[in-house]
């Protein structure tokens, strides 16, 4: 592992072990129109689907990278968006970490056995698509 990556991993492990800013940070980044439309991070619909995404960091040539994907163009609410690799929970997934790892393998070709899971960020409810998303780091 590179000299750059090891201190980064230690810091991320430390930070994930503490209190995360969660919904406060999410609201700080939310579009202003959310409140006017009655969208809420606090009210997750009972029929919300579960999803997982992977924030994957990797070193290459003394730099850190994080892969993002460009979603295809279609008629849905996430058409053409840039995001972390991820998607919906499959009944064959053991949990949402498995979902994130499976989707990352399908979307960017990273084998789950090559990933060191450090922890999770605060789940995010995506009102527009009715998904409760668990980010895995």
Describe each region flagged by the PLM.
Residues 1-83, 88-137:
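N-terminal leader/linker segments that precede catalytic domains of diphosphate-processing enzymes
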